[in-house]
A protein has these predicted regions:
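Charged, low-complexity intrinsically disordered terminal segments
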Residues: 1-122, 126-265
Length: 265
């Protein structure tokens, strides 16, 4: 891959299969770190395929940090807590609700001002060298793996100096007061051998997927071919990365001076 000094490289991921391939490729090729930040991480087929790749990375010695918003974790934080039993996997929940049972919805209504402050960032960074940013969460509907519903969205595979800024944004959220270690959030008890159980289940799910039509689509993916040929056609340009800092969530009133809406109207 040819690099350009001081410029960043961008490759747009408009195809849903390519978007999955890019994330899977980063997970299986990471050597030191994986930083993963999402609003939604579904425990469906695509989510489990990526979880298996991430768990394999941790087994290789890669330090994995996962930051996920709490809004869609009702009853599902136990699987994340199982993964966090791995010595190389740290998981934090963004703005977690106190109630983890059916009182959760009541808390959402009573404390809407706080509970409504969510994290929509979507970041996947490998080795502080390659990153994916964009609109897709983790789930079948984002990667063309559902029959009844699939979303159209856009991500960018990025390399170069901008990855440092993307990594800094992850660190800001990871270290913020809104991010709580999952061990302090989930009250459900897990033991070390459950990690072996979930590893076996994820391995079995991936092995069965290798005979599926979806796996054939992955093999035929345009990005898969480019990765194998080591010929990803990055567009190189000067770039700046803008993001909302987590401190914005502590403000009671929006800063209208930085909003474009009033000026347009």
């Amino acid at each position: 891959m040819k690099t350009q000094q001081k410029q960043s490289g961008f490759y747009l991921l408009s195809d849903n299969i390519d978007a999955f391939v890019a994330r899977f490729a980063l997970a299986i090729s990471a050597k030191k770190t994986l930083d993963i930040q999402y609003y939604i991480i579904h425990n469906d087929a695509s989510g489990q395929y990526l979880a298996y790749a991430i768990l394999q990375a941790a087994d290789r010695g890669v330090h994995v940090r996962i930051l996920v918003d709490d809004i869609n974790l009702s009853g599902r934080d136990i699987r994340l807590k199982m993964l966090s039993q791995h010595d190389n996997i740290d998981i934090r929940i963004f703005n977690p609700l106190s109630n983890r049972d059916w009182f959760r919805n009541l808390e959402m209504i009573v404390h809407l001002d706080r509970a409504g402050r969510r994290m929509h960032n979507k970041v996947f960074v490998a080795d502080n060298a390659v990153a994916i940013i964009g609109g897709r969460n983790i789930g079948d509907e984002y990667f063309d793996n559902r029959n009844e519903l699939n979303f159209v969205d856009l991500d960018a595979l990025t390399v170069g100096p901008i990855v440092d800024d993307i990594g800094s944004s992850f660190d800001d959220y990871w270290n913020s007061c809104w991010a709580t270690p999952i061990e302090q959030v989930s009250r459900r008890h897990v033991v070390k051998n459950q990690l072996s159980t979930i590893r076996a289940k994820l391995r079995d799910r991936w092995q069965r997927a290798r005979n599926s039509q979806y796996f054939k689509s992955i093999q035929r993916s345009d990005l898969t071919k480019k990765i194998i040929a080591r010929e990803i056609p990055f567009v190189w340009a000067n770039a700046r990365f803008f993001y909302d800092r987590p401190e914005k969530l502590t403000r009671n009133k929006p800063e209208r001076t930085v909003h474009l809406g009033p000026h347009i109207m």
